[in-house]
């Protein structure tokens, strides 16, 4: 990780100082023009700490679940998680998905059956259109779970404010949570805090690339 790359990015620029969450205060080094500025050293330490845990997960051949339900992050999380063959949710989160693994497994099996039906010539055009609609709906909601056979070891959440339900489910199951947190976020429930400008796609890309470099 080269410091110059971080300095040249906007990764260290936090939100307005009046919105500072006390739990994130230890990651702030000073303010400029009323903006909180993250300590680059602490960003690096936080990222490397999570990278060490991710290495352990890969070594044990366990899974990491990516969450990117917020429009701002959706495309990035979708493409990145697929590129490293990890499960993801980039649309609506179905409550209980973590606590009831059998439900999404059933939906993935249903998706496979529907795709087989679409290939059969014996079905009418109307029936095939109906199958295609069902296929699309299931794919959007459950397609990202395809690579998830059991409870993930880590969940990386792009926006904890949008996905509070997932945070609560993960805590009940004692699943580790990592998240990209700005200076206004509450980090009290997060195991691996990634302090950064989470309003910047570039910041998230930089961190993800560092975390998974030489692992995939």
UniProtKB/Swiss-Prot annotation:
Keyword Ribosomal protein: yes
SUPFAM superfamilies assigned to the protein according to its UniProt record, in alphabetical order: Ribosomal protein S2
Gene3D superfamilies in the record: Glucose-6-phosphate isomerase like protein, domain 1, Helix hairpin bin
Keyword annotations of the record: Ribonucleoprotein, Ribosomal protein
Coiled coil region boundaries: none
Keyword hit for Ligase: no
Domain of life of the organism encoding this protein: Bacteria
GO CC terms, sorted: small ribosomal subunit
Record's signal peptide: none
GO BP annotation list: translation
A GO molecular function held by the record: structural constituent of ribosome
NCBIfam families: rpsB_bact (TIGR01011)
Family: Belongs to the universal ribosomal protein uS2 family.
Name by which UniProt lists this protein: Small ribosomal subunit protein uS2
Species annotation: Carsonella ruddii (strain PV)
């Amino acid at each position: 990780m080269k410091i110059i790359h971080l300095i040249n990015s906007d990764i260290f620029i936090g939100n307005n100082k009046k919105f500072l969450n006390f739990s994130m205060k230890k990651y702030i080094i000073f303010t400029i023009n009323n903006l909180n500025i993250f300590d680059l050293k602490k960003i690096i330490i936080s990222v490397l700490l999570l990278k060490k845990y991710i290495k352990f997960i890969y070594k044990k051949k366990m899974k990491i679940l990516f969450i990117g339900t917020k429009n701002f992050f959706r495309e990035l999380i979708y493409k990145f998680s697929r590129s490293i063959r990890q499960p993801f949710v980039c649309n609506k989160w179905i409550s209980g998905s973590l606590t009831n693994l059998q439900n999404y497994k059933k939906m993935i099996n249903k998706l496979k059956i529907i795709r087989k039906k679409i290939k059969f010539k014996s079905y009418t055009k109307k029936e095939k259109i109906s199958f295609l609609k069902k296929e699309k709906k299931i794919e959007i909601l459950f397609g990202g779970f395809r690579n998830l056979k059991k409870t993930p070891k880590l969940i990386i959440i792009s926006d904890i404010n949008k996905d509070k339900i997932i945070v609560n489910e993960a805590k009940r199951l004692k699943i580790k949570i990592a998240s990209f947190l700005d200076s206004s976020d509450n980090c009290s429930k997060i195991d691996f805090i990634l302090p950064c400008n989470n309003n910047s796609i570039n910041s998230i890309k930089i961190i993800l690339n560092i975390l998974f470099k030489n692992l995939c």
